[in-house]
Amino acid sequence: MVHQYKLNGYNIVLDSCSGSIHVVDDVAYDIIAMYQDNSPEEIVKAVSEKYAGRQDVKEKDILDCIEDIKALIAAGKLFTQDTFSEMAGTFKQRSGDVIKALCLHVAHTCNLNCAYCFASQGKYHGERALMSYEVGKRALDFLMENSGSRTNLQVDLFGGEPLMNWDVVKRLVKYARSVEKERGKNFRFTLTTNGMLIDDEVIEFCNREMSNVVLSLDGRKEINDATRVDYAGNGSYDRIVPKFRKLVEARGGKNYYMRGTFTHANPDFTNDVFHMADLGFTELSMEPVVCAPDDPAALTSD
């Protein structure tokens, strides 16, 4: 499968099955887009019409580009076949129905009102609710009972905002720690948080019990505060950044990462990555927004 996109003036072609990334000019970008569904003659005609008047785009140049594409295909670097497709249905069979990870939705609610939230402010288009300790405990028992001979088990504490169910989070981690040795298991917990409820107790707990912490920040203050707001419409940047910096500093090199979302409002999101790096954060991830195509935040060709 080939993905094509434009970023910061570059034409990028990603061949996902080989992992090859190509940075190409406009002509090659267009030819690659047409390559699988058009004959060489049709490509020459369409490209010649589009770039009429350009002295560097003649029929020979177009045909040379087509030959270059053929060479990349032959080398397994473009339009590569998915060699794993036939195995996809056998993964469950080969795993022996073993479960090794669990995402616990401990808080079906949130204290932020982010405009682009795919989870509808943590409610997932339902009613606000918090997971009970009993349900969480049964989920951890289920994971252990169905993990077979696996020792390391991953549990993600998610929401909504999981710190809104703080007491249950602490009790569930305590329960897991109390039984993991006798069950021959090792729990690795990850917490995802928007940072609003972080305090010294949370920092100490996370740095003791969490194998990883995911901290939500969209980068520059003006970008973050355009969407990541509370229910009064106030931005969150000034309240969460000091807490994130304190947590990361106290973490002493343990795993964490800043998790940002880029939208139609910040196609220059590399500047948000640089901003977070300037704040002292070294583990960074920016992900595209997940929303309906007609949402104002949606990423479009515009």
Residue ranges and their predicted role:
Residues 57-72, 79-82, 86-204, 209:
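Conserved alpha-helical substructure of the radical SAM core
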Residues 61-62, 295-302:
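A C-terminal junction/extension of Radical SAM enzymes
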Residues 1-35:
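Acidic, low-complexity/disordered tracts enriched in E/D and polar residues
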Residues 119-122, 221, 290-295:
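A short small-residue
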Residues 38-54:
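Short acidic, hydrophobic short linear motifs in intrinsically disordered regions
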Residues 125-126, 223-228, 294-298:
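A short acidic, helix-capping loop that chelates divalent metal ions and anchors anionic groups
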